[in-house]
Design a protein with these regions (language model features):
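Hydrophobic core
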Residues: 12, 16-17
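Alpha-helical transmembrane segments
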Residues: 4-11
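Extracytosolic ligand-binding ectodomains
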Residues: 2-4, 23-378
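N-terminal signal peptide c-region/cleavage motif recognized by signal peptidases
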Residues: 19-21
Length: 378
């Protein structure tokens, strides 16, 4: 049996392992990050950048393994994400904590595979994001999110007649929907309407909503991002349609949309591995540190990135890699180490990884109440 190394974040510092690898002053691994800092998905990139910086500062303060971190904007665009990757390579990147969203992550994953660069995406959930042996993820995959959502709805008897509105042009959205539909049948749920939109037509959802309403949908499943979700909630309210709404991690950020009446988000449920209102010391310390440094409450994407940085630290310590090694040699050692560590993180206790890049962790459900995310699993 492989020996397991267990770490927790500095938010639970009393249990932190001390690095067994010696690092001279000035020696540091260069970790790059890529994600949207501008555009419709910017809240995700900003959260990942902030939380990674927070983790890096904490880790460096310990005096053991050291990291430098640089983050590049990709505007949630695949081509720009590859350009950002090349910019980070020019900087001297040795590992990538990214990218943030799925389509850009797939494009960049092809580049990291060619370079044999270690890649850990905090939130790229499409299956293809970790198709290569050098790539791992912190978040749940799209199929896992889809199946878990159907299971949660069915097991908690939230509804039996389900409407779905999804983006058929987006790998994240369509991937979740496909697995949701499969598991819904196993749960005895009836999908009474399943209506798609595309990236070229994502402002008017009246047709999709009307079909769900006419079909008697009691709950509308939204495996989409928060910007489109805010429009759907607004338009549903205008037409007097008030079903339950349930989504996945893409809805995280809904309360930050400019001009959106957040009262319309009351009661919205989403499946996520992180709830900022959790009362464990690790979460409370992280939320307090994040709010002090950046203002605002951290979303799941921030927690994913924070856990990801500590996973990289654990794998570095386990593998014994040093900053003077080649990118390829670092990657080979990190691949093995990732399957031998256990991380007690914000998004899961006892988190481990399989050789296929997938994490082993438990989902949680949260509900928006009075403008905040409240755990439904307390």
């Amino acid at each position: 049996m492989k020996k397991m190394v267990k770490v927790v974040s500095l938010a639970c510092a009393s249990a932190m392992l001390v690095s067994t690898t010696a690092f001279a002053d000035g020696d540091a691994f260069k970790v790059g990050g890529i994600g949207p800092m501008t555009g419709g998905a910017a809240v995700y990139g900003q959260a990942v950048k902030n939380a990674t910086e927070l983790a890096v500062n904490e880790i460096n303060a310990l005096g053991g393994v050291q990291f430098e971190f640089q983050f590049e904007d990709d505007e949630h665009d695949a081509e720009k994400s590859v350009n950002a990757y090349n910019t980070l390579k020019d900087w001297g990147m040795q590992m990538l904590l990214g990218t943030v969203t799925s389509a850009p992550c797939i494009a960049v994953a092809a580049e990291t595979a060619n370079d044999n660069m270690f890649q850990l995406t905090p939130s790229g959930s499409a299956v293809e994001c970790v198709a290569n042996p050098n790539a791992f993820r912190v978040c749940f995959s799209d199929p896992n999110q889809g199946a878990a959502s159907a299971q949660y709805i069915g097991e908690n008897k939230l509804a039996t007649k389900i409407g779905v509105i999804y983006d058929s042009s987006d790998v994240y959205s369509s991937g979740i929907y496909e697995k949701f539909a499969e598991e819904a049948a196993n749960q005895g749920l009836e999908i009474v309407s399943a209506e798609a939109f595309t990236a070229d037509n994502k402002t008017d959802f009246s047709v999709q909503l009307q079909k769900a309403k006419d079909a008697g949908a009691e709950l509308v499943f939204l495996p989409i991002y928060y910007t489109e979700a805010s429009l759907i909630l607004t338009q549903a309210n205008s037409m007097g349609f008030a079903p339950m709404f349930f989504g996945c991690d893409g809805l995280d950020g809904l309360l930050t949309v400019d001009g959106f009446d957040t009262s319309l988000a009351e009661g919205v449920m989403l499946l996520t591995p992180f709830a900022a209102d959790a009362d464990d010391e690790q979460t409370k310390n992280f939320v307090a540190a994040y709010e002090e440094a950046y203002g605002g409450t951290p979303i799941q994407f921030a927690a994913d990135a924070y856990d990801g940085m500590y996973a990289i630290k654990a794998a570095v310590e386990k593998s014994g890699v040093t900053p003077d090694m080649s990118v390829s040699d670092i990657c080979d050692a990190m691949e093995t180490a990732m399957t031998e560590i256990t991380v007690d993180g914000l998004t899961s206790k006892g988190m481990t990884w399989n050789a296929d890049g997938e994490p082993n962790k438990e989902p949680k459900a949260v509900k928006i109440e009075n403008g905040s995310y409240v755990s439904m699993d307390k």
